[in-house]
């Protein structure tokens, strides 16, 4: 604690530095001069801001407040992120969540520019330094068609399958990039009859007979079991894809973002 001589010494030094009288000393105590009043008004505001910041940081440390911005691709959202978002919100209701719906390239760019705390996206992806990607899970995709494919247990060759109208996510998506490469590896060219913006649009189009499509098995399995669509067995093996966490170590994560990341990695 500061004693009286130390306080007096500090007050004298402050007056010398500012070149004006701040205090009027008398037997009754100390009062502020006009200059002292002006300084006090500014200092008191600064103190209030500092006190509020300390209180806010204390609340963030206790996870009573804070915010997280997550950039996510649609498949990553459906297959991994949604249940974790639910658990996190239930455990830390005071933390605000902001979710950006991006393609993988857009999501990676948002993390690079500091617009998102991190991204949860599907491969293929490019994450160059200072970005870092961590695999969270792998998933398999299958060919899916309407009821006309029911009972066809014999695996089809890819070149025969694509004689049917093909529904796909559009150019610029990692899914389009992935299947372009897969088709080329099998001496074929990806040429969708229908391109859509979101994965949610693929399934209804298949169900209504507009064509066949490739969808994550985890995503479409319940609909197959309900008998609304059919899995089409393929001779060719579709490579597995991954869902990855992308971070930017240039920007230190907030306490809330770090806690969410731990929940995401441990799941």
Specify the residue positions occupied by each region the protein language model found.
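Short beta-strand->loop
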Residues: 132-142, 226-240
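Central regulatory/effector-binding core of bacterial HTH transcription factors
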Residues: 65-127, 196
